[in-house]
A protein has these predicted regions:
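Short cysteine-rich clusters marking metal-coordination/redox-active sites
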Residues: 8-11, 43-46, 328, 348, ...
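Charge-rich, low-complexity segments
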Residues: 65-147
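Short linker/helix segments within small regulatory modules
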Residues: 22-41, 336-343
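Small-residue-enriched alpha-helical segments and adjacent helix-cap loops
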Residues: 94, 132-137, 159-318, 467-471
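Short metal-binding segments enriched for Cys and/or His
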Residues: 35-61, 356-364
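Flexible, glycine/charged-enriched surface loops at secondary-structure junctions
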Residues: 188-194, 227-229, 267-273, 335-338, ...
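Short Cys/His-rich "knuckle" micro-motifs
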Residues: 18-21, 53-57, 289, 336-338
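Iron-sulfur cluster-binding cysteine motifs and their immediate structural context
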Residues: 293, 322-343, 347-370
């Protein structure tokens, strides 16, 4: 069977490829073929502009011949004995590998990964992989993800599994060695550490190797999931394992999260995926406000704790306390030599700026979590930041019942009212934030405002105001 390729007339880069049977039987492809053939295009490889060349190739791999022209004969024969000087099949990867520093391109060639896919991605400046849906697998209710290949002549699509990482991403060396052995045995020999969702991904597993690979992964004590319309793998900051600013035990809460919601993590039941992130303080090292459908942020309600001796010692060592006070968003800090640092509790916004800058200032003791919802980077209406659902809840372990009951109530509202494949942020935007708060049973409070109002003109009906003397 004959194949028809539309390629760049200058560099020969193939833009699209069809079979003669497809052009004869599929009107959609025939129409696109005529459209591309008759228009001027820009080659993504050499950036040359012009009409595409119609090249026809026999299925058996015969010589390529441009339509309407004979194949050009070579003016000179190739010298005998110089085959070793042929052009490298991966020139751009070779260029990356040059130099005295280690190169990922060099290491990639040592694995089973089809390096021509990466070479073509470098040349075209875009990935040659795409989303290919799911593969059903017994024992994995959410399915296994498939990466579709845009270049089937190089390689077919490949599967990859997402492994739920332990709290804090603390892997033992024995567990990591076991995962590396599984990757070498069943896949490309590559581990993705870690994805933007906090997963460990095992790449390039052929369909026939999926079952034994998953069985060996689970035998190491790991769960497979984070696909489909369920709770995706939650991500948390390292919290009390290293940071002294954390306002609750992020690692303990995440462990309790999986005990409470493990079924919803492994069995899809929501209108769309739900990403959850846990930050120990408003610094938000996990970017939960930008990316999480459900975001638990550590907060405190009283004034920061000030160790006057540490602050004075820091100032004596050259600390610029004047600049810190002037840049406080709430203008709540005042420094007086000899009297120390004073913080106005009513003006404090609890933003962590002073705690980040001054060693002697630490968060207050009235601590808990704020529940925010609706953050995302993609979706129907584009990026959105999270909105406050509940401004403060005490995070009391080990089961964190009050926090999880609030989240469960919210997910019931989302499950009952959202449309299919509608993210949480898109759902809130469609019905309106006021209607969403009513459905969730949230009492209005100043902390729920997105921003202060700028229009000070107000209108009200007499019946809306109890004290008529205010009219």
């Amino acid at each position: 069977m004959e194949k028809i390729k539309l390629s760049c007339a200058k560099c020969g880069f193939v833009i699209e490829e069809y079979t003669a049977e497809e052009l004869a039987t599929v009107p959609r492809k025939a129409k696109r073929y005529q459209y591309l053939k008759n228009k001027s295009s820009i080659c993504p490889s050499c950036l040359a502009s012009g009409r595409l060349q119609d090249v026809r190739v026999n299925e058996e791999g015969g010589p390529a011949v441009a339509a309407g022209a004979a194949a050009p004969a070579s003016s000179t024969a190739a010298p005998v004995g110089h085959e070793e000087h042929a052009e490298s099949p991966t020139p751009m990867m070779d260029a990356i590998s040059q130099g005295r520093f280690p190169s990922h391109a060099t290491e990639l060639k040592k694995t089973k990964y089809p390096v021509q896919m990466y070479e073509q991605a470098l040349q075209q400046r875009r990935t040659q992989w795409g989303y290919g849906g799911y593969v059903s697998l017994p024992g994995v209710a959410s399915g296994v993800l498939v990466r579709a290949s845009a270049r089937p002549e190089i390689t077919k699509g490949s599967n990859f599994v997402r492994i739920m990482d332990p709290c804090g991403n603390f892997f033992s060396t024995a567990s990591m060695r076991g995962l590396c052995d599984i990757a070498d045995k069943y896949a490309y020999g590559l581990l993705h550490l870690l994805s933007t969702g906090g997963d460990l991904e095992l790449l390039g597993i052929p369909t026939e190797n999926l079952k034994p690979a998953v069985e060996e992964i689970t035998s190491l004590g790991f769960d497979i999931g984070s696909t489909g319309d369920d709770y995706r793998t939650s991500e948390e900051c390292i919290g009390p394992a290293k940071c002294d600013l954390t306002l609750y035990d992020t690692l303990g809460l995440r462990a309790a999260w999986y005990k409470r919601f493990l079924d919803d993590v492994q069995y899809p039941r929501f209108p769309h995926k739900i990403k959850c992130k846990f930050a120990g303080c408003p610094n938000d090292c996990v970017r939960g406000c930008q990316k999480a459908d459900i975001f638990l942020c550590g907060v405190y309600r009283d004034a920061p704790k000030v160790d006057q001796q540490k602050v004075a010692k820091w100032v004596e060592a050259g600390g610029d306390i004047t600049t810190v006070c002037s840049r406080c968003p709430g203008q709540a800090m005042q420094w007086e030599a000899g009297k120390g640092l004073r913080v106005d509790e009513d003006s404090c916004m609890h933003c962590m700026y002073c705690s980040n800058k001054v060693p002697g200032v630490r968060p207050g003791g009235d601590r808990g979590v704020a529940v925010l919802v609706g953050g995302k980077l993609r979706g129907k209406f584009g990026p959105m930041l999270s909105r406050v659902l509940v401004p403060f809840i005490k995070a009391e372990g080990p089961d964190y019942k009050e926090v999880f009951d609030c989240i469960e109530k919210f997910t019931e509202v989302y499950d009952a009212n959202a449309r299919k494949k509608e993210r949480v942020g898109d759902f809130i935007l469609r019905i309106g934030i006021d209607e969403f708060y009513k459905l969730a049973g949230v009492e209005p409070s100043p902390q729920l405002l997105k921003q202060p109002r700028t229009n000070f003109f107000c209108h009200w009906e007499p019946a809306e105001v109890k004290d008529e003397r205010r009219h």
